[in-house]
Amino acid sequence: MSRAPDTHSDFIPRHIGPSDEDQATMLAAIGAASLDALIDEVVPPRIRSRAPLALPAARSETDVLQDLKRMAARNQIYRNYIGQGYYGTHTPNVVLRNVLENPAWYTAYTPYQPEISQGRLEALLNYQTMVADLTGLDISNASLLDEGTAAAEAMTLARRGSRSSSPVFFVSQHCHPQTLEVVRTRAEGLGIELVIGDESRGLPECFGVLLQYPHSLGGVADYRELAQAAHAQGAVVACVTDLLALALIEPPGQWGADIAVGSAQRFGVPFGFGGPHAGFMACRDAYKRNMPGRLVGVSKDAQGNPALRLALQTREQHIRREKATSNICTAQVLLAVMAGLYAVWHGPRGVRRIAERVQSLTGALRAALAGLGVKVANDTWFDTLLLETGVATPAILAAADCARTNLRQVDGARLAVSLDETVTLADLQALVNVFAAGLGKDEVALPAPQASLDGIPAAVRRQGPILSHPVFSSVQSETDMLRYLRKLADKDLALDRTMIPLGSCTMKLNATAEMIPITWPEFALIHPFAPASQTPGYRELIDGLSAQLCEITGYDGISLQPNSGAQGEYAGLLAIRAYHQANGQPQRNVCLIPASAHGTNPASAQLAGMDVVVVASDANGNVDLADLRARIAQVGERLAALMITYPSTHGVFEEAVTEICDAVHEAGGQVYLDGANMNAMVGVAQPGKFGSDVSHLNLHKTFCIPHGGGGPGVGPVAVRAHLAPYLPGVLDAQGRLDPEAKVGPVSAAPYGSAGILPIPYVYIALMGAEGLRRATEVAILNANYIAARLRDHYPVLYAGRNGRVAHECILDVRPLKETSGISAEDIAKRLMDYGFHAPTMSFPVAGTLMVEPTESEGLAELERFIEAMIAIRAEIAQIESGERDRDDNVLRNAPHTAQMLLAEEWHHDYPRQQAAYPVASLRENKYWPPVARVDNAYGDRNLVCACLPVEAYA
């Protein structure tokens, strides 16, 4: 494959970093004759694919985008009044251009390294403050995957926090139907008894209650007495709520709710055919240590200045594994940032004004429809009306279709309409005319909207201000907003500045051509429950991408519904569980998991109702075959599955993978192959053809969806034919599950985060079969080049046959702790002074660094990283020799801020120049960490998860 592009539109050499000449140099340096020879040395021959993938050849950016435009044009943009948790919204253009379309925001990683993540941590703290303020609760997390999964997480949080011994969780029938189905799926896996009913008739004995506030079909109830009754029996009260409605109605925390969940979608994030959108959760302080998802907290840095960080991480799956509060890993950070900035942009008066306008227009519509003789079933409302349309229902729906308008069909005799901030008076008059036409009546004029809150009972009207923190009143103009966004972005390190060599994270190029289609109206403005006749373009995209991914993986079926890798794991394990049950083997509920597995693996197994048994690793980091066989014998007929990551989390292709799969199959189990490391296999090995039964993929890793600072992601689950009937169920246009479905949905929308599926589709089309294979080969080359160049300075902990690694390598820095007192964390923080994000720390082996360069980093950037790591080793050598102090040195004090280096006095055992400019190239291009090393322990001891007063930064 020639490096030099034949035309300016040749994409492959723009995605792959090293030129052909650079690749030759690197191959010579590691002693490999060619890329093909290197792959032969790395990938076991028993699994190596020789035939090219049956995919079209690479195409130009122009061709691919034109084809996608054709596809998008097949979607029909209707005026939507469906509601049901998804609403029209205006994305502020300043946020669209400077956040959603800005690689400084969308290419960042999860802020586990807080010193280089202060900008997005501040934006997330705004979001948490907004959610806690509007819900009236003590603490909010930094986003969940969507509203339905947030409700399921509320159920599990209620079970952990309840004083009741009852196995029952009560769910109001007034919840959105898709929420009911996602909660039902979760309850079945955990053995929770779900009771769905009308809460006005009283509560059964239960450990928790889930309410909808306002109701799915429009009512606004006073739940104060119900909450008291639930608390009296030891139950936890959760409610699904609407952030915009909470500008006008009483916060759930004030009437007794313990947990509030929902979606922040209508705060500036378009439909996207169902996602991605940020789910939210807020709760009382008593539940904070059991709360799922990431949590931004305020701490201080080494200089005593306020600094932000991810708090209470010991709750999370990467630490607690099967004992974690949730399997949540990737969430929806980019969308949470947008929602929080929507509140900053509009401010408290603006948000309340939008809410008042929506409520006022709903009242005007109610009056107009009453004038047509339509019976409105709900006497209270915020934005939704339930209409008893009887035998006229089909005619009204036909009239709506003629007017390119979508209504929510509740059943054969009832419709519902929901309004939002995008609705104009002209839209509303057109809607009234639709009903007049359907009823065969003369058109009536829409009455003038009245500025009143008549639809909201006086007892539940919000009293007092909203969004009272000064940050929400800080922006007076677009100039202010632009500068605020630039200030935040400048605090962070993302791929637009530097390589992010995080092992197991695949921080590769997110090309502009891949990103462009996600904001096209034909993709962005489609409601997830729009009729199928309006979404043929989306269905062509979904079917095409599904077929491509099946070809790449060698599987027979796939679901794109899971909206994170962890959800894909969960869906795959549910499929295995349902398969065993269908075969009359419900006792198969044990999942074998290697000790080195990703933390999501055991957490997902637990959510799927499985018991986890750990399998040991051998001295080379591989699955210990003898221990595997012993564990299989130990669990016997209870064996459900083995979860294995491949290539392994130790960065090698295990030679015995087919033997491992055979052993599990012979014992009646299924093999789940975690696809987190698929970037090392595309085009060279197909897991569905070498023994695995099911895998999830991380489209936000291998297939170029950006990480967004911690989401969005898409985690499709791919299966062999025998598991295909057990893929997640797809909801219909009313949000209801097909009664023939064998497994329920795992996401609220039928196709999950469909709005970002154009990204992997474009990537695959631009690369073609040959380009995808070459990307894998170069990813492996880059990792082996780094390993070879650094091996004399840091031991490479694991290697496969021929001394090769896969697409990542583990640098063993543990001996340095003994000789110098320097830890992996010290090296990670010192890399910030060199302008780098740290590699993955202490996973899968404590005290090590795991490096994954991906194929997108060129030789010059690899050399810059290598230079930094060698220079840091020399700094450690100065400590080892006694030339530098063991406690006061450039590593222990890293990172160094400009404030530290400009201090009037300097008392350290090394010069300022070494701290700031350890290599000459930094004088030309220097990133300054905005805070010094963050005190993690202080932040957890003094937990604050909302914006600090302005005075704290003085």
Swiss-Prot record:
GO molecular function: glycine binding; glycine dehydrogenase (decarboxylating) activity; pyridoxal phosphate binding
Keyword line: Oxidoreductase, Pyridoxal phosphate
One Gene Ontology cellular component annotation held by this UniProt entry: cytosol
Reactions catalysed: N(6)-[(R)-lipoyl]-L-lysyl-[glycine-cleavage complex H protein] + glycine + H(+) = N(6)-[(R)-S(8)-aminomethyldihydrolipoyl]-L-lysyl-[glycine-cleavage complex H protein] + CO2
Modified residues (N6-(pyridoxal phosphate)lysine): 701
Annotated InterPro entries: GcvP, GDC-P_C, GDC-P_N, GDC_P, PyrdxlP-dep_Trfase, PyrdxlP-dep_Trfase_major, PyrdxlP-dep_Trfase_small
Gene3D superfamilies for the chain: Aspartate Aminotransferase, domain 1, Type I PLP-dependent aspartate aminotransferase-like (Major domain)
Enzyme kind, highest EC tier: oxidoreductase
Cofactor dependency: pyridoxal 5'-phosphate
Pfam family, one: GDC-P
SUPFAM superfamilies registered for this protein in UniProt: PLP-dependent transferases (SSF53383)
A biological process from GO: glycine decarboxylation via glycine cleavage system
EC number: 1.4.4.2
HAMAP family, A to Z: GcvP
Its biological purpose: The glycine cleavage system catalyzes the degradation of glycine. The P protein binds the alpha-amino group of glycine through its pyridoxal phosphate cofactor; CO(2) is released and the remaining methylamine moiety is then transferred to the lipoamide cofactor of the H protein.
Similarity remark: Belongs to the GcvP family.
NCBIfam families linked to this entry: gcvP (TIGR00461), PRK00451.1 (NF001696), PRK04366.1 (NF003346)
Subunit and interaction comment: The glycine cleavage system is composed of four proteins: P, T, L and H.
Protein name in UniProt: Glycine dehydrogenase (decarboxylating)
Originating species: Bordetella parapertussis (strain 12822 / ATCC BAA-587 / NCTC 13253)
Lineage of producing organism: Bacteria, Pseudomonadati, Pseudomonadota, Betaproteobacteria, Burkholderiales
Gene that produces this protein: gcvP
